[in-house]
From Swiss-Prot:
Pfam families: DUF179 (PF02622). It comes from Pectobacterium carotovorum subsp. carotovorum (strain PC1). Belongs to the UPF0301 (AlgH) family. Gene3D superfamilies: VC0467-like. InterPro entries: AlgH-like. This is UPF0301 protein PC1_3712. It comes from the Bacteria. GO terms for cellular component: cytosol.
Length: 187
């Protein structure tokens, strides 16, 4: 099972403070484990514009039609000082990895320098920190009914209002997440 380019949807019974009602976009899943970013937990009072100012990046030429007041997301509990940018394909960045035909992840500063300019990727999501699972750990959590999985959807990732992403991801499975029992079992 390879869950790269899938969403993990936290089951209602998952009460962990970081992952409660989370949608995690899985960027990588292989024999070493899995790595992903929470896409529905914005950081309080922290926008892309704040990040650019903190890093002394002045978008030039500035395109006023591109909003920089978009939130930065808490990607997960690990390395919360490291930035990750999910974006639609746009070549030329120093450290980009293609996740799917619709999505890339970049960790180099050069992508930040394009934000707010005409050369930025069409869609972006900026996160600090990431989520990771050791080999077999995610599979164990799936067996324990902690998560639902569904192939990722570019519209949910980049366009669905943040407060609706958890429910929208579950709806891809035909499920109203609010109607799921918190009791788990196996047939």
């Amino acid at each position: 099972m390879n869950l790269q380019h899938h969403f993990l949807i936290a089951m209602p019974a998952l009460q962990d403070s970081v992952f409660k009602r989370s949608v995690v976009y899985i960027c990588e899943h292989n024999e070493d484990g899995a790595m992903g970013l929470i896409i529905n937990k914005p950081m309080d009072q922290f926008s892309v514009e704040n990040v650019l100012k903190k890093l002394k990046i002045d978008p030039t030429p500035r395109d006023p039609a591109i909003r920089l007041d978009k939130p930065v997301f808490m990607g997960g509990p690990l390395a919360d000082d490291r930035g990750f940018i999910l974006h639609t394909p746009c070549p030329g960045f120093g450290s980009s990895i293609s996740i799917s035909e619709d999505t890339m992840i970049t960790t180099s500063k050069d992508v930040l320098e394009t934000l707010g300019t005409p050369s930025q990727p069409e869609n972006t999501l900026v996160a600090l920190g990431y989520s990771a699972w050791e080999n077999g750990q995610l599979e164990e959590e799936l067996l324990e009914n902690a998560w639902l999985t569904t192939p990722a959807d570019k519209d949910i990732l980049f366009h669905t209002p943040i407060a609706e992403r958890w429910r929208a991801a579950a709806r891809k499975l035909g499920i109203d997440i609010h109607n799921i029992s918190t009791e788990a079992g196996h047939a």
